[in-house]
Amino acid sequence: HRGARGLPQLRDAVDLMDGGAESPQETRTRLLLIAAEFPRPETQIVVCDEFGNFIGRVDMGYREWKVAIEYDGPQHWDGPEAHARTIERIADLEAQGWIVIRLSRDILRYRRSTSLARVRDAMRDRGWSDHAKARLDASLPL
């Protein structure tokens, strides 16, 4: 109701919500991209080939520019089979013309600006016209 304390902050928080994240780190990655002035990424993008065959699903990204952002948590390295599946899935996505940017907790923590620059450069190379406004110094508590 009118005059309720915290209502503007609540509206901002609701606007940032996205049910597609499968981990807190995926959420933090998405929020970092938004804080860095990138377009809001789509989450859990299903990628199919030209015949409609399922290729894979990416954590988040930009379908328009075929730029995928993958957060690699420990499950991606949980044994040789998981590792092989991850490598194969990335190769299949790249064969469909996607640029895949892989991030991890340590990369986001210690090389945040480099990570954001990779996303910016990939999107610029694919035609994103607002690349100059990307803030590589954006931060969130990661």
Regions found by a protein language model. Name each.
Residues 1-142:
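Surface segments flanking catalytic/ligand-binding clefts of nucleic-acid enzymes
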